[in-house]
Amino acid sequence: MSFKTLDDIGDLTGKTVLVREDLNVPMQDGAVTDDTRLRATIATLNELSDKGAKVLVLAHFGRPKGQPSEEFSLKKLAAPLAHVLGRPVSYIDWESDKAAVAALTPGAIAVLENTRFFDGEEKNDPAVIERFASLGDIYVNDAFSAAHRAHASTEGLAHVLPAYAGRAMEAELKALQKALGEPERPVAAVVGGAKVSTKLDVLKHLVSKVDHLIIGGGMANTFLAARGVNVGKSLCEHDLTGTAEEILDNADKSGCTVHLPYDVVVSKEFTANPPSLRTCNVHEVAADEMILDVGPAAVEALADVLKTCKTLVWNGPMGAFETEPFDAATVALARTAAALTKEGSLVSVAGGGDTVAALNHAGVVGDFSYISTAGGAFLEWMEGKELPGVAALEG
C-alpha cells in the first residue's frame, strides 16, 4: 500500500488545501456530545495551517438528501472545531464560497458548508467534483471513516487534484496494514455482536487470514446451534446455521482455529443481575434460558490464546455488555489484550461503534495499539474489500 502523506506535500506558500474530514459528530441541544472525531483533525489541520496554507475543510453532516437545511448546516461546528484546534475557524457557505476563500489569509482555517447539500456529492458527479476542485490547489483525505464511499469529496477529488493522506488517515492505514496486511503471527481476531448476518463477509474473509478466530456475542449462539447445541431461547439465527457450518469448514481448511464458548452465563430474563442468573456448560442450557455472556472458564482459555499471539484484531463485544453482569467476558478479555499490548508482546487494533463503547466500558481504550472510530469503513476493511477513498490515494 503506497500513498503520499503530508511529508510529500512540499511548499504550501500561496496554496489552498481542501481537506476531507469527518465532522459527523453527535449533537444534543446544539452542543457536541462526543468530540472524538473533531480531535482526530488536529494534527492535519494545524500542520497545514502552520505551513501557511489556506485550509478548507470539506465534510458531511447527517443525511440532508441533496437539499440545504439549517438542521444539517456545518455552521454550528465552526466554533467547536476552533475550540479543539485552539485557533480561529471561520465558516463559508456555498453562496459566497469563491469570494470568501479569496479573502482568507495564509494559515486561515475555514469549514465549508455540508458537502451533501449538493445532490451530486453522493453520486460522485463530475460537476460537483469540479465545483469543489475549483476552490483549491491540493486535496488531502483525512477521513478514513468515509473512505468506503465513492463520493465527490471522498474519492472524486483525488483524481483531479494532487492527493495526499492526512495524518489521521495515515495512522489508520498504517495500523490496519500492521494488523491484517502484513501482520506478525500468530494473529487472532475477536468478532462479537448480536447477529451473524451483519458480519458474514467479515467472518468468511477472516478465516483465510487469521490463526485464531474468537466468536462471541449473540452470533456465537448461531455457531453453537450449527454444532448441535441447544441454545434455549437465546438470540440465534437458526436459518444461518448452514452458513455457520460452511465458515467452520473453511476455517478447518485454512488452518484457522475457531474458538466458541464452552461455558456460558445464562438467565431466564434479560435484566441487570437477574435472580435466575447462573453459569453452565453450553450443553446444559435449559429451554427457557438465554445465553447472555461467555463463561469464566472459556474467558480464561481465550486469555491464554491471546498470550500466544502477536497480533489482534477486535470487532464487537463478547456478551450483552451494556447490562451487568453480562459485561464480564468483554471486560476481562479486553483487559488481557490491553495488558499484553502494554508489555509489548501484542499489536492490538480494534474498531466499530459497539467495540469502542465496549472497550471504553472496560477502561482500556488508551492501552490498545490503535482504536479505529470508523464503523462501516472498518468493517469493509475487515471484509477484505477495496475502499474507494483509499484506493484513490494510492499511486
Curated annotation (Swiss-Prot):
It is an enzyme of class 2 (transferase). Keywords: ATP-binding, Cytoplasm, Glycolysis, Kinase, Nucleotide-binding, Transferase. One of its GO terms (cellular component) is cytosol. Its EC number is 2.7.2.3. One of its GO terms (biological process) is gluconeogenesis. Pathway: Carbohydrate degradation; glycolysis; pyruvate from D-glyceraldehyde 3-phosphate: step 2/5. Its main location: cytoplasm. GO terms for molecular function: ADP binding; ATP binding; phosphoglycerate kinase activity. It catalyses: (2R)-3-phosphoglycerate + ATP = (2R)-3-phospho-glyceroyl phosphate + ADP. ATP binds at K199, E322, G352, G353, D354, T355. It is found in: Cytoplasm. Substrate binds at D22, L23, N24, R37, H60, F61, G62, R63, R116, R149. Monomer. Belongs to the phosphoglycerate kinase family. HAMAP family: Phosphoglyc_kinase. This is Phosphoglycerate kinase. The gene is pgk.
